[in-house]
Curated annotation (Swiss-Prot):
Catalytic reaction equation(s): orotidine 5'-phosphate + H(+) = UMP + CO2
GO MF annotation list: orotidine-5'-phosphate decarboxylase activity
Source organism per UniProt: Streptococcus pyogenes serotype M18 (strain MGAS8232)
Superkingdom of origin: Bacteria
EC nos: 4.1.1.23
Protein name: Orotidine 5'-phosphate decarboxylase
Similarity comment: family membership: Belongs to the OMP decarboxylase family. Type 1 subfamily.
Length: 230
């Protein structure tokens, strides 16, 4: 099911920056935000509790990757924060993914990271010693996530159609690396516009700097939201 709101990546490290950004939006505007490693490691669980107290949805993107017992226990702790979505690394293997699902339970959305959108095929082959194509690697990880009963994967928008062809109906694709036309792509290698992501049926999109670093973040958010909605 498509999420109508773009997920905003809160690329901050301080509570003050985060609060100042969220305060720009009217109280009735309920956002879906991503808390990544920087903000979570700087502020801890309290930042999740604060954002949830405002009525926003929280995607906690910590990309857990460890032995199954450790991941299961960590997910059980994160579940207590009432998060709406969490991530694990698909490279941890099917047993680790199953353990993550057990720890988190069935309610929060659980998705696996396949290949980072900053990774090129040459980098994958050289650094990870994976000698298939980048797409084949992503599809392999996606099928493993589906086998482990995860809800979906994080992937490049260019990979969505192929993933949906090899996974069960309802398997979701969350696509970072979304940039409005003409914006700086930063360190992302595989990017698309919100309109392009909508056309190829991404279920969630994540947008960070084009919103958080815009001169008018609220206007930037509304423009991207409208383009995503079509």
């Amino acid at each position: 099911m498509k999420e109508e709101r773009p997920i905003i990546a809160l690329d901050f490290s301080s509570f003050e920056e985060t609060k100042a950004f969220l305060d720009l939006f009217p109280a009735e505007e309920k956002l879906y935000v991503k808390i990544g490693m920087e903000l979570y490691y700087a502020q801890g669980p309290d930042i999740v509790r604060y954002i949830k107290s405002l009525g926003h949805n929280v995607f906690l993107d910590l990309k857990l990757h460890d032995i199954p017992n450790t991941v299961r226990a960590a997910m059980a702790v994160l579940k207590e924060l009432d998060i709406d979505m969490a991530t694990v690394h698909a490279a941890g293997g099917v047993e680790m993914l199953k353990a993550a699902r057990e720890g988190l339970g069935q309610d929060p959305t659980l998705i696996a990271v396949t290949q980072l959108t900053s990774t090129s095929e040459d980098q994958m082959r050289g650094d990870q010693n994976i000698q298939t194509s980048l797409l084949e690697s992503v599809l392999h990880y996606s099928k493993g996530a589906a086998k482990a009963q995860l809800d979906g994967v994080v992937c490049s928008a260019q990979e969505v159609e192929a993933i949906k062809a090899v996974t069960p109906t309802g398997f979701t694709c969350l696509t970072p690396g979304i940039r409005p036309k003409g914006s700086n792509i930063g360190d992302q290698k595989r990017v698309m516009t919100p309109n392009q992501a909508r056309r190829i049926e991404s279920d969630y999109i994540v947008v960070g700097r084009p919103i958080t670093q815009a001169k008018d973040p609220v206007a930037a958010y509304q423009a991207i939201k409208a383009e995503w909605a079509g």
